[in-house]
Amino acid sequence: MPRAALLSINARVAETKPASWEDQSLVQLWGPRFNVYVVARRDLAIFSLGTLPDDAKGMRRAEDLAARLHSVLGGTRMRHEEAGDALGLHNANLLRYAAATGTVLIRWEGAKQATVWTVPPPAVSPRDARLELARRYLHVYGPATPESFGQWSGIGPRSAVAAFEALRESLTPVRTPVGDAWILASDETIALVAPGPVARARLLPSGDAFFLLQGTDRELLVPDAARRPELWTPRVWPGAVLIDGEISGTWRRAGTTVTVQSWDRISSAAREAVEAEATALPLPGVRRPIVVRWEE
């Protein structure tokens, strides 16, 4: 949701404002696995057309829905439930299939229905968009496997394997504690360089790319098996507390109260850094100061 996107930006970009996610350089869409993404406008095709089904049936469904939606809207914007009714859909969420054409944008603020509208088709082929999506995934999540890419993107294992095969000459095989995987050859130098300085504390929102991992990859980020279910819960995930670049706990917010659950005893300096991060979160509509409550 946009608030999570805003906090992800805040964790990485200085002077993030409550309205930063609404910048004209950004767009909202139903992206990989039909989840809501906020991405750079120039990357719209990558995160939409890159997930277009390879099979004829899936492709027809996406393209037919997109064409019908474009016709119904006629250049206007509409709540997605109303658009679903206008198309005779028994479930308006089926509109998400149309997003894989790269012609559907949305505005969703979390509490209300999403507003949908259509835009011209991207000037890029589905294949090129898919391969760039795989490159982006490898750059952020690598070392990675075709299987993990297929899970994350929702395109399935066969299509993911095909994408990695197409990129084979630009990939480098690596061995990790959880198995063999791949990185971009262009990232090999970065992977071998010792990490630079990191922020003392960061609060990452639910679903942040830093810990949006599946399967055994989670073991690399949180080695303690007893702690992993606390971060990757069966329902809505909490946020992750980063201290000196390592996940050291979880956090949730209710109104103006941020509750931090630390996994280990932390220093007073680290505690102060976490509290400073929490009180500086650029939360839209929050008028009172943030209060931090600790659970240890």
Task: For each feature predicted by the language model, list its residue ranges.
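Long, low-complexity intrinsically disordered regions
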Residues: 1-211, 216-217, 223-296
